[in-house]
Amino acid sequence: MRERLAALCPFLTGGQLSQFETYYAMLVEWNTRMNLTALTEPAEVAEKHFADSLLPMALVPEGARCIDVGTGAGFPGVPILIARPDIRCVLLDSLNKRLTFLEAVLAELGL
């Protein structure tokens, strides 16, 4: 997963890639208990969840604020928070179980 994401997003630092690895591991683990995503293969997650979430980031000004409505498993909000620490992004979802997962992810990643 790390190699694929690094190839797709060469601007990510080693520390950020490590955060994405942790996020991926938690996503796969929690997905066994609750339906967070249909995609769990490393290359698919790297491309279709992580890299796709970061596509518009070059157009977003420094210090911007956003809200990820219906974030689900955290896409695109968590990848944005990892890749752009200058951006404040609020994650919003209607299901408490998803928010519990996201709280655990954010705590583990220090975001």
Where do the model's predicted regions map?
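Class I SAM-dependent transferase core
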Residues: 1-63, 97-100, 104-109
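Alpha-helix termini
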Residues: 48, 66, 83-87
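A short helix-to-beta-strand connector/capping loop
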Residues: 87, 110-111
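Conserved SAM-binding motif I beta-strand of class I
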Residues: 88-93
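Conserved SAM-binding loop of SAM-dependent methyltransferases across substrates and taxa
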Residues: 73-86
